Amino acid sequence: MTKDLHETESPARRNFIKAGMVAGVGALLTPLIVKTAQAATEAAPAAAAAAAAAGEKPKLKIGDVLRVAREKLYPICRVCPECDGVACAGEVPGMGGIGSGQAFKNNYNALNKIDLVMRTFHDVKKPDLAITLFGQKLSMPVTSAVTGGVSYNMGKKMTEEEYVISILGGCQDAGTIGWVADGIGDQMDVFERRIAVLKNTFGGRAIVTIKPKTNEEIIKRFRMVEEAGGIAVAIDIDSAGRAARAVPGQTVEPKTPKQLAELAKSTNLPFIIKGIMTVEEAKIAVDIGAKGIAVSNHGGRVLDYTPATATVLPAIADAVKGKTVILVDGAVRRGQDVLKYLAMGADACLCGRPLVRGAHGGGRDGVALMMNIIKDELTVAMTLTGVPNARNVPANVIAKVQA
């Protein structure tokens, strides 16, 4: 029997045909893609050599940085076109979100759904991105986030020293500052190596975060940071539930307000509490003397199904704005993301996973490139929303609250 051309085919037959078509196209295109990639790879050294012969430093390109990062980090990080937590869900240790990965995805999705209001009837031609953070003048309201664990989170493709130099140096070259991490599974000697780089290479110009160990162990590390000339100290209290991964004798734990007050009083450096997700705890942080808070769910890596930082930030900012420095992290991928967070009440943002890519794909220069791209995007976004400076971003920049 002849089938009518308009008769509906079975789903199974359609899927079989589609699969065949995809396979056929893939077979045709794969050699071309490989050949093109090989040609680009072979041409890169020649271009670099020509630039060197001319006395020029080869200009780093974002495509090259991402390609190298993908080669080094795969399969721990796939360097996806959109770093949204989907492909790496459940990959902890690694670069993903814990469990279902929903907390990581919440961060990305909530921020991605926020729209900006374009305004062009104004005289804002060169917006001022500069801020002062804990006495440091920064070129933009963005620092690195707290990222570490090059051995168990990043595949050990860099040494601790190389990674710290890349993050802090790249941030410095972009006119801002970075953070030094304290890994949950790190022995004391690993922390000491990071602090040595901070002191000897950067004169202490960074913020150092400590895991919520016993107060005695935290204060011991505070003294090391003070001696190194650090800008500020922090604890990432959002790591309090990860005792099973801690080094024996270096357990982590939640903290009472009394314990937090002891930490705040124990140092002459500004004390920051990272991992604030409620108005209640933001107020407590202010009361015990914290000079800064970081609204953070640890990149979605500690408690599955936590809300996005973009969801909780506005209420926290309403409660404590002006009483302490408000920092925020969570899916900062572009300059537009920074503007959104500033409009919701943050004083500055922390950028994490993109800088991990930058460090592995281009070292110090790769991190600087990532940060400068964000800076350029923020400049354009502020111009097109009529925001003259990053220190006072109005809420009506966000579409849902526009005047």
What are these regions (language model features)?
Residues 309-315, 360-378:
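C-terminal helical cap(s) of enzyme catalytic domains, especially alpha/beta-barrels
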